[in-house]
């Protein structure tokens, strides 16, 4: 082969290699996250997912890590999971949570499961989305007490998180926006819908006579002649919460210590109103009420059976103040038996929701 031909072939080979590098080597990997397939039990309705934060495998797993990540706190000792523990349905078994500075809050931690269906978050409803809710604890002086700027700096120099955020959100710089988006994605997967009640409702198991009696009491009003627990107005199935706000007669006007919803609306009509908590997994979420005043379900039932305290904002549904629900000892035991059917063991022990660092 002549020198000229060899030179031409050599040049063509160089051009070919360069073209391959242009198309295959220099082009960055295409952002292609894996859609997360959300499994919702048939007893629960469909879930609305924000268009700007779709669920992905990468985002959910990152959110799980961040939920358990103590780097999000000022001294590196607390995470979201410190006050939202899986064994107690992602709430705190203590009456009040204690922040990194040793300061206690004044409200009991709410559960973090099935919260994707709730239009507002916190006892006073001050957050309108899971993303908005997740912004607060990190900077709260009685909670994790850090700054988002400091958290971002820690995550950006971390050995793993920059790559994980790149895969989840296609970002080169980590900031609070994508941290809370990831946490919110994980929290949307915290779905509890496989309790004994769910299985009974689907026709898979049978209730005992006592549980059926409790279910009946749960769903009827007290009359002048018969007992009724009257729970269903605020705690109706399938969520066992109405997601709204009520003053359930815990205190009279002179003893209100927490203004509740009033802090958000500044309406006198909303004083001492708090968000209705779900009764799902209620057996393991003690203590109860916004201030954790009741240590047991028995105490909660006694409060309602007593009838509660009157006040200027007490809910009209608390219509038996003074004479209560007329529940007999047997009725109370039946109601408690039903409430225990709302416990979802599969959810409470699901390894997909556990600490990934253990």
Where in the sequence are the language-model features?
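Periplasmic c-type cytochrome electron-transfer domains
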Residues: 21-358
């Amino acid at each position: 082969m002549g020198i000229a031909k060899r030179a031409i072939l050599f040049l063509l080979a160089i051009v070919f290699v360069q073209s391959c590098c242009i198309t295959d080597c220099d082009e960055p990997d295409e952002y292609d996250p894996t859609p997360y397939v959300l499994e919702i039990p048939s007893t629960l309705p469909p879930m609305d997912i924000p268009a700007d934060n779709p669920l992905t495998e990468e985002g959910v797993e990152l959110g799980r890590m961040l939920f358990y990540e103590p780097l999000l706190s000022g001294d590196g000792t607390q995470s979201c999971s410190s006050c939202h523990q899986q064994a107690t349905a992602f709430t705190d078994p203590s009456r009040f949570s204690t922040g990194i500075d040793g300061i206690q809050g004044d409200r009991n931690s709410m559960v973090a499961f099935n919260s994707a269906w709730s239009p507002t978050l916190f006892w006073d409803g001050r957050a309108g989305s899971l993303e908005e809710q997740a912004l607060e604890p990190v900077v709260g002086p009685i909670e994790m007490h850090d700054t988002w700027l400091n958290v971002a700096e820690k995550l950006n120099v971390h050995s793993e998180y920059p790559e994980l955020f790149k895969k989840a959100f296609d970002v080169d710089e980590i900031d609070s926006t994508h941290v809370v988006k990831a946490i919110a994605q994980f929290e949307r997967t915290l779905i509890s819908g496989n309790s004994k009640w769910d299985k009974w409702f689907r026709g898979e198991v049978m209730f005992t006579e006592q549980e059926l009696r409790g279910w009946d009491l749960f769903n009827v009003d007290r009359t002048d002649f018969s007992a009724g627990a009257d729970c269903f107005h605020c705690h109706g199935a399938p969520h066992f919460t109405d997601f709204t706000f009520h003053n359930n007669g815990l205190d009279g006007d002179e003893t209100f210590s927490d203004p509740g919803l009033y802090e958000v609306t500044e309406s006198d009509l909303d004083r001492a109103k708090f968000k209705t908590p779900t009764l799902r997994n209620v057996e393991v979420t003690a203590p109860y009420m916004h201030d954790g005043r009741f240590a047991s379900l028995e105490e909660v039932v006694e409060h309602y059976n007593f009838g509660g305290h009157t006040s200027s904002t007490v809910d009209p549904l608390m219509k038996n103040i003074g004479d209560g629900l007329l529940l007999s000892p047997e009725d109370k035991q039946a109601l408690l038996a039903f409430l225990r059917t709302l416990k979802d063991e599969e959810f409470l022990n699901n390894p997909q929701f556990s600490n990934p660092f253990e």
